[in-house]
Amino acid sequence: MIKISQGLDIPISGMPSHEVEHTAVRSVGVLAADYPGLKPTMMVNVGDTVRAGDKLFENKKNPGSFITSPGSGSISEINRGEKRKFLSISIDLDDSINPMQFDTTDPIKCLEESGYFTFFKTRPFNRVPIIGSKPTAIFVNACDTNPLAVSPISIIKHEQDNFDKGLNVISNIFDPEVPVFCSYHDKKPSSVSNINFKEFKGKHPAGLVGTQVHFTLPVSLKRQVWTIGYQEVIAIGHLFTTGNIKLDKYVSLGGEGVYEPKILKTSAGANIDQLTAGKIKENSRVIAGSVLNGIHAKDVMSYVGTFDNQISVLPDEANDILFNWAMPGSKLHSQMGAFLSSWIKPKKFIFNTSINGGNRAIVPLPPYEEVMPLNILATQLLKAIVTKDIELGVKLGVLELAPEDLALSSYVCPSKYDYQTILQENLELIFEEMA
């Protein structure tokens, strides 16, 4: 067991129950934001009919890396932003159209053709692996310590056979020289024999795969590992059992803005507006993913992402309060103990979307180190990435990180920096220089 002592569990109200509700939607989508570095070559047009598993686009920077349709129906929208940047694809579902059938005899080819190869991400760089590459190890994350996240075990138990099958497939993709590690918290998720199970306990970010990789097999430019989430393993198990991609997934719905926080079983890539209709309160902000590192789910971005296991909903109260800085803060959470709440110590806080401050220079305060469990000089690293000193950043350990690993640093930052976006920009610069 590996115990993580540094970090922070945010005491946010609205924890979902383990009740599972089946919720149907009329449309699904695919988000470009799920695939860093993506340069798509479109293989469909608006109005085309697609089967679940049909190819939607290929990453021209990684030939053979396909993103496929999460459901059967017709392409209703291909959404673009500024400078025609690709944002998302929307598909109106039609249950009468049968899904694609895949040949599973060649595991690697099956994963590539089905689009499930894109479930893997690399460390360093947090990208889909280059087709034909081989990792030093594969890490399966069956542990989640994000705020409002339900235990993966509560979902795996509904899909145990698929999860076990997925682990077996992944462990046999390469020769035995590529070990497969599976993290868990409290309860072992499977009894598959050829998997190295690692128990992680402690505060968030104990449940992030970056933390698990750091304490198991740290990465470098010469040592690359692949990572994958537990629901993606379940989907792979389903594919190799049935020959079809998995059309549904589980996503928890939690936060103060939800009437009845619970787990929803819905279509993969579900339209979040349709999924949450009648379930959330007025004047709420819907976040696809964690409150720490999710994206605002609105307009053409309102879909459950490929790697999202939760939807978080907070009261959207961004208006400034007069003399808020002088208030005792009995209902505000502070990692630094700056408010009266540090003495009252309520068990849960009602969080909203206000950031309670504005941008200013980085101040070297203890919270950065206190929430960073990795063997990294946090303050120095943050300064390096803000100034885009990539050489210093590499020396300080930036290659071990993905944006989610700096979410707590952004949360405790009195200077209100978005370190996750800044880190991604640095990783892109380093990757391009290497290329």
Features from the language model and the residues they span:
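Generic structural motif
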Residues: 34-38, 50-53, 62-77
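Generic structural signal for buried aliphatic residues
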Residues: 50, 56-57, 264, 272
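Buried, small/hydrophobic-residue-enriched core segments of structured protein domains
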Residues: 65, 72, 78-435
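Acidic, glycine-anchored pre-beta loop/turn
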Residues: 44-53, 79-82, 243
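Short, surface-exposed secondary-structure edge patches
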Residues: 40-41, 45-48, 64-67, 160, ...
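A short N-terminal beta->alpha junction/helix N-cap motif
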Residues: 38-45, 154-155, 414
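Glycine-/proline-rich flexible loop or hinge segments
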Residues: 52-60, 95-99
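N-terminal, Lys/Arg-enriched amphipathic/low-complexity engagement segments
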Residues: 1-43, 58, 90, 197-200
